[in-house]
Amino acid sequence: VVKATRKSLEEIVESVGSFSRVLNVGCGGCVSVCLAGGQQEVTELNAELRVHFKRKKEFKTVEGFTVERQCNLQFYLGLDELAESADCLLSMACGAGTQLLAERYPDKPVFPAVDTVFIGIDRAPGWYEEKCRACGECVLAYTGGICPVTRCAKGLFNGPCGGTNEGKCEVGREIPCAWYDIYVRLKEQNRLECLLSIKPRMQWKNQSQRTLIQRGFEKRYAK
């Protein structure tokens, strides 16, 4: 799922600026799982903000509300009334949730309280590892389930560069070479023929905002 990390208190305080009534909106989805923006984190951040404002003798109110999923308007029930009484909103959701919150309340300044970092897995509580860049052209079928876009420092599509040495990346001796691992994985599966065909490079240029409509919903959203 999406992984995020909380912004510094200083940056958040600077964002809310002169606004007197702050509503901090958390998300019970991805950011809750990675301990960055769920109900508990909303409570903790609000406590820090109240202490800060009290020390600075700034008279501000800080309220909190957590929706199950901030990236889906169906879960915004109960938030409208609270948002109406706030001067500004803080979002502890990922970038997508923050933007939907801003779209829902266009007359309210919305400030992110977390930085969205990557799409990844849980290795252990508090330890997360990037696995996907959401490139839109998944190549895992021929790389043994190892993503070269994410794992390779150069994002190479057709084997390792000349700097790989004993299974390590030239960027750092502690970094495994993605293509070495891909080779080992495919060899174990007797699928080394996957490496023989040349794959076209990723088309990164001229990218615009992407929209996904799943199969079966085309007619519903046809223009």
Kindly label every feature range from the protein language model:
Residues 63-71:
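Short beta->alpha junction loops
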